[in-house]
Amino acid sequence: MAKSQRDLKGWQYFLDDAELNNTDSVNGEPTTPSRRSRRGKSTSSQKISLKREEDELEIKEGDFLLVQQDNNSPEVAIVKEIKFGNDNFLDIIVSWFIRMRDIEEADLPKVEEYKERSQLNENELFITSYLDEVKLGEIIDKVNILSEEEFNNDIVIDDSNKASTFICRRGCDSAGELFTDVFDFRDLCVLFEKNHHEFIEFIRRKTVPVAYNANKTHDKSKSIKDKLDEVETKKPKQKTVSKQILDEEEENNDSSDEFESAIDLQDEPSSDELESDEDASESKNKSPRKRKASSKPKAVKEKQKRVKIPNNHSKFDDESRQFITSVVSPLNKRMKIKDSSKPSILALSPRKPKKGVSKGENGKNGSLGVDASSEAFKELKEKLHTSTRLSSLPCREDEFTSIYLNLETAIQEQTGCCLYVSGTPGVGKTATVREVIAQLRELTEMGELNDFDYLEINGLKLLSPNVAYEKLWEKISGLKVTASNAALLLESYFSQDTPRKPLIVLMDELDQIVTKKQNVMYNFFNWPTYSNSKLIVIAVANTMDLPERVLSNKISSRLGLRRIQFIGYTFEQLGSIIKHRLDMLTKQNKRKVIINSDAIGFASRKVASVSGDARRALTICRRAVEIAEKDFLSSKEDPGNEQEIENESYHVQISHISKAINETVNSPISQFLMSLPFASKLVLAGVLLRMKRSGLAENSLGDIIDEMKNSLTMLTSRDGDKVLEAIDSKMTLIDLLYGNGLLQNLDSTFNSKDTNIRILRFKYIVNELVENGILQQNVRGERHSLINLNISEEEIVSVLKRDKEISSIL
């Protein structure tokens, strides 16, 4: 990359264009291109090559380079394109390789050559589809990359060629986690020479997960040979079309500049599409925008409308529609099939394949600096993030085994069943179920288990509980229908004895799917009891006895006795979870940044005393690392300490953990909750207690009022007299809050039985909490209105437990 011609100092660039090299046959001078040739010439045909004046190193498209960015270890890349840019004078686009040393051993393909770390070839590279820009000053030299056959037959690695000769036989994604099958790298180079856009697209389709590439799954099975044949067949057609259009332009003598034919308007993408998808636009070698005015544009359009686009799913869709009609039509129902659009490929922005290097703006490293300590801090924060993929789930072995055995048995026996999983938030319920599904998938791929389908429904993501019917039917048939029709179709589908694979449905956040009639949950728990359904339902909720408290007997009985409870993590388990993530660090970063065991124990005990939520413990540790990193950077600014700091390890101590905990304690929401009066805290305590008893996120205002009074009565019986001793030895909190006021309570004629149903100013208290975003209320002031928390339950619990008067209620 060169931002201006000034940045090209020490380099020369050449335009490899056959037309520019043409000379007049008579006088040897360059000829001026005719208007016809200039119009027919595409700027994309000009290739740029570079030459370094110092050592005459020449660089062109397809060369393999050794690049060193920001004082990091050199990496290998292939030059995809050298072109004149919009923001920069010259852009050098490369596709990165990942070295073997940057791949975690657990992520390598499970094949014989990668079985032991000692047998791995350190000179093996993995090609990726990740594109990036490099600067001219970052280019070190060229390297050689060979195929497996060339490397094994002709090359002996020694000190002379160890840093410049490599082997490539697989590709992978930018994270180094998904790998392609073995290929011949020389065939891949031939594909690059023919079309470098198809080269990148081929690697991308082989390494992008199927979930992000659902509409192109058929390309997964294509080999390099197939892709080469496809490119060969495409080339003549494109040239013919371009030539025909160009000839038509010449015949009209450029008199039709303001017109475009119907064919070209349909085939050529708009300018907005060209800007949004560079790879797609460059792969289509279109001729210039001038077009011949079509004499019969309408006829051409009508002809194009009759062209039938092949659809691989048409037969499957027809069968699904026929089944829908047979089920819905006899009941005189109006069938409505929703518009279903295929999932588009997500606009992923993969991180750079070089692990441990994070690029920021302008090609520089992020704000953490470029030294090893900053990279260690960055990796440590990544491993402590709650979304980090783990190779195993520590401290959940028993629960994992129970779920695994239940699902494996149901799949093998081709029967339906219900499994109820409960536990407080953050104890690993959903993660454990997903890990079980992943393990079962591996058994299926090895042929040791029957194949099955899997669907995940999250109650928080549904607009209404009935949408669950639509999700399930869409998974089965591929068509979207209305909820009412989907319920009928599902009932008929599970009643019929037709060949089908077992279907596992994970219903997360079950308490959000509860309705007044309970018909949604009844159907989902009833269908597995059908003899031919092969439906396996895993219900996940936050309360163990939710079926008994909320559901009717006919629903709770269908859940059976297959119940698995996840209890909150103890401080020892939280410490094990944090240490497990720290073990995932590289050896170099382990030595550079260390979290003291005392600090881990301090964070674990603090979280275990409140909720046992692993996510909260990881968040606190991650924030402590950020605070420690800030201290490290501030100490690094002192010039005298820079060399000493580089050679030492940095420790995350208890003080950093304490600061992170204090930040959560002293957050604006926590400070607001601490400033609330006793009556407002009593309302919040009533909400928490009611949620614990009912197992539901939403509870009626009347139930919360009753919970408040019952809890206050129990508190009064223990130590309520001591709270108001300074005012009156006979006065209790119920007299104060549910009476007609303090002055009336001090009156000798006041009867303690004459109390109100609600505490004084109750409506004002609830409105204050709603307006400040603590509670949500759908109908104000009504006893049957539903109340739910608008902030984290843990944040309220941590504040109320520090209040001496209210903590005894909880």
From Swiss-Prot:
CDD domains: AAA, BAH_Orc1p_Yeast. Residues 286-295 have a biased composition (Basic residues). The keyword Nucleus applies. Keywords: ATP-binding, DNA replication, DNA-binding, Magnesium, Metal-binding, Nucleotide-binding, Nucleus. InterPro entries: AAA+_ATPase (IPR003593), AAA_lid_10 (IPR041083), ATPase_AAA_core (IPR003959), BAH_dom (IPR001025), BAH_sf (IPR043151), ORC1/CDC6 (IPR050311), ORC1_wHTH (IPR048867), P-loop_NTPase (IPR027417). One of its GO terms (molecular function) is DNA replication origin binding. It is found in: Nucleus. Its main location: nucleus. Pfam families: AAA, AAA_lid_10, BAH, ORC1_wHTH. GO terms for cellular component: nuclear origin of replication recognition complex. SMART domains: AAA (SM00382), BAH (SM00439). Mg(2+) binds at D508, E509. Residues 21-52, 219-317, 334-370 are annotated as: Disordered. ATP binds at G423, T424, P425, G426, V427, G428, K429, T430, A431, E509, N542, R615. Residues 219-235 have a biased composition (Basic and acidic residues). Residues 57-183 form the BAH domain. Residues 21-30 have a biased composition (Polar residues). Residues 247-280 have a biased composition (Acidic residues). One of its GO terms (biological process) is mitotic DNA replication checkpoint signaling. Belongs to the ORC1 family. Component of the origin recognition complex (ORC) that binds origins of replication. It has a role in both chromosomal replication and mating type transcriptional silencing. Binds to the ARS consensus sequence (ACS) of origins of replication in an ATP-dependent manner. ORC is composed of six subunits. This is Origin recognition complex subunit 1.
